[in-house]
Design a protein with these regions (language model features):
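N-terminal glycine-/charge-rich "phosphate-binding" loop or analogous flexible N-terminal tail
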Residues: 1-42, 162-166, 302, 317-318
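Phosphate-binding beta-alpha-beta segment of Rossmann-like dinucleotide-binding domains, i.e.
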Residues: 86, 92-141, 156, 160, ...
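Short, Asp-centered acidic motifs that coordinate Mg2+ and/or phosphate
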Residues: 43-44, 65, 196, 224, ...
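Rossmann-like dinucleotide-binding domain for NAD(H)/NADP(H)
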Residues: 88, 222-318
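Rossmann-like adenosine-cofactor binding region
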Residues: 51-57, 171-266
């Protein structure tokens, strides 16, 4: 019987799938290091955000496969798993719909002042509608920074709101961008024309602090920046300073650096920020599908039917 370790809360659908196939599936907490004492007995791992480093791998004497509960894998030390020839599988295009919807929700929340209006109605201030103006999305200019799976869906949704959609992706030739959108050749030019900027950039060390003081100072003082991608794309100190100085500038953040944010993080105290707890993909439907993808990656691997399109480190088989 193959033994599967699950670290972090995972939807029951995939776990039931594995148990029905006679796998032993153990769910352990990663809130402390006690799970490390048992690592040596498991053949497979389903992991969310737990750090899988050299210590982890060296303790996992029988580990044959890692199934990442997500698309990114910056919590996994690729070098050590390559050295041990342990395959790492991701889930593929499962979360693009909920994350793109969440992006639009943050944009709407900011434009329509939902959080502020809600708080004022609860304070019996119904007349706030006469003094505090929200905005239409129609005809507003939005820059989608990164045109991958999620960026494409966000672009389509923005079109439904009759927004002017601009696309920038340095890894994509301009002719790959549909003519229904406007391609941006140089990200440093004309940044001040945008009402919204939303980030959809995959993990890459070169992208760290991509949005810094220099970038922010080129934006309109009434722009809003949305990040449902990666916390480290934005220099939080620079963003904090910019938000404090420009009260009409807004941010919608689902991701932080580090996570969770410290309770003393000043972003949590600002009115011109909308915050969610890295929950964009955490819908019932998406979590069930993510769990099933992890389970199938494991069962397919042990049945010699692995889906190499979901395999991160293909070189271990070359």
């Amino acid at each position: 019987m193959k033994k599967v370790l699950v670290l972090g809360k995972v939807h029951s659908s995939g776990l039931k799938f594995l148990r029905d196939l006679s796998y032993q599936v153990d769910e352990l907490s990663d809130q402390d290091d006690s799970y490390k004492e048992k690592l040596n007995i498991y053949d497979a791992l389903i992991v969310k955000m737990t750090k899988v480093d050299s210590e982890f791998i060296n303790l996992s004497k029988n580990l044959q496969i890692i199934a990442r509960h997500g698309v990114g894998y910056n919590n996994v030390d690729i070098n050590i798993i390559n050295e041990k020839k342990i395959p790492l599988f991701i889930i593929g295009d499962v979360n693009s719909t909920p994350v793109s919807e969440h992006t639009i929700a943050l944009i709407l929340n900011i434009a329509k002042k939902i959080n502020y209006y809600d708080s004022q109605v609860r304070l019996d201030n119904f007349n706030v509608r006469n003094t505090f103006q929200s905005r239409d999305l129609s005809s507003k200019k939005i820059l989608i920074y990164g045109y991958g799976r999620i960026g494409k869906k966000v672009a389509q949704l923005c079109k439904f709101f009759n927004m002017e959609v601009y696309i920038y992706d340095k890894f994509l030739s301009l002719d790959k961008i549909p003519n229904t959108f406007k391609a941006v050749k140089n990200i440093e030019e004309n940044l001040d024309i945008f009402d919204f900027i939303t980030l959809h950039i995959p993990y890459n060390n070169s992208g760290r602090s991509l949005i810094d003081k220099s970038f922010l100072n080129k934006l309109s003082k009434e722009c809003s920046i949305i990040n449902t991608s990666r916390g480290d794309l934005i220099n939080e100190n620079d963003l904090l300073d910019h938000l404090k100085k420009n009260k009409n500038f807004n941010a919608g953040l689902d991701v932080f650096d580090p996570e969770p944010p410290s309770k003393n993080n000043e972003l949590l105290k600002l009115d011109n920020v909308v915050l969610t707890p890295h929950s964009a993909a955490y819908t019932e439907e998406c979590l069930a599908e993510m769990s099933m993808h992890c389970a199938k990656n494991i069962s397919d691997f042990f049945n010699n039917k692995m889906n190499k399109s979901l395999l991160v480190n293909k070189d271990i088989y070359s």
